[in-house]
Structures are given as C-alpha cells and as structure tokens.
Design a protein with these regions (language model features):
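Short N-terminal helix-initiation segments at or just after the protein's N-terminus
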Residues: 1-2, 78
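Active-site histidine-anchored catalytic micro-motif
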Residues: 2-73, 102-157
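A glycine-rich helix N-cap at a beta->alpha junction
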Residues: 77-96
C-alpha cells in the first residue's frame, strides 16, 4: 500500500499547540507498568482539554504475563479497574480489547476490536480537526488500524 506524505506546511501546522479541547484515544498496556496508570488518570482528570473518545488495551509480554494475549487481557481488566477506582463515568463500551499478538511484519495488520474501532473512528476526522492518538504500549493496535483505514485518516500521534 503506497502512501504519500502530507506537505511540510500541513505537518508543521499539526505540531502547533491546539487552541481548544482535542479528541484523544489512549492505547495502553496498563497492567505492564505504572506510567500507563498515571497517563489514564491524567486523561480522566483533564476532560476540559482532552476529550477521551476510547481506550484500547495493548499487548505486552514480560514476567507479568504469559504472552501478548495474556498481557492485553490483563491490561483490559486494569483499565476497567482504574475507571471504577476513579469513579469515572467513562462508558465501558468504549474500552476495547486489543491485539493478541504483535505485528508479524510491516505489511500484515493484526485485527482486534481496538484496531477496528480506531480505524473507523479515525475516518471521522479531518486535517483541521485531527484525532490525537496517545500510544504508550506496543504499537500493534495503532499500526493495524492505520493499515486498515488507509491514507484517508487524520491523526496526530
């Protein structure tokens, strides 16, 4: 799949500080390390500037999991646990399970509910109103969504 890069002025404009609230999704391996829990807490506490649209559980594999699928499931459960602890009214139906494996290569996406949702959601945005993607885990969900969505998406990562 061949993609063309946006013109330099367009790219530079995307780097400017937004003047109002921005729409954000968080792709996170929340169970893996504590920084992800802080990031989620910050997003929940910053809804005037950051309009949270979805949460995606990312895969991870280390001593805290038996494999990427187990890491993703633990992160999914941790997201729900943190939302409950925070007393958040963020709808649980906007929390999505991510990929159960890592990307096998640069061309092959790994589909998941998270990747499907992000691909669909990203198509609703424009260069003047981009979707901000905060990815602080493995990039499998985001890369798979971008592969699926194609060149018509407008996201800032």
């Amino acid at each position: 799949m061949q993609h063309t890069a946006p013109a330099l002025p367009s790219l530079l404009r995307r780097l400017e500080r937004p003047t109002g609230p921005v729409d954000v999704v968080l792709d996170t391996d929340t169970y893996n390390e504590v920084d992800d829990q802080f990031a989620l807490s910050y997003l929940l506490a910053s809804q005037e500037q950051l309009s949270l649209k979805a949460l995606y559980a990312a895969p991870f594999f280390n001593e805290n999991s038996t494999g990427p699928a187990d890491g993703m499931e633990k992160s999914y459960a941790e997201i729900l646990r943190l939302l409950d602890l925070a007393g958040s009214k963020f709808p649980s139906e906007l929390v999505f399970r991510g990929s159960q494996n890592y990307l096998p290569n640069e061309e092959t996406p790994v589909f998941s509910p998270a990747a499907e949702h992000l691909a669909k959601l990203a198509r609703e945005y424009s260069p003047d109103h981009p979707l901000y993607v905060v990815a602080i885990g493995a990039l499998t969900n985001v890369a798979s969504a971008l592969r699926k969505a194609g060149a018509e998406v407008h996201v800032v990562m």
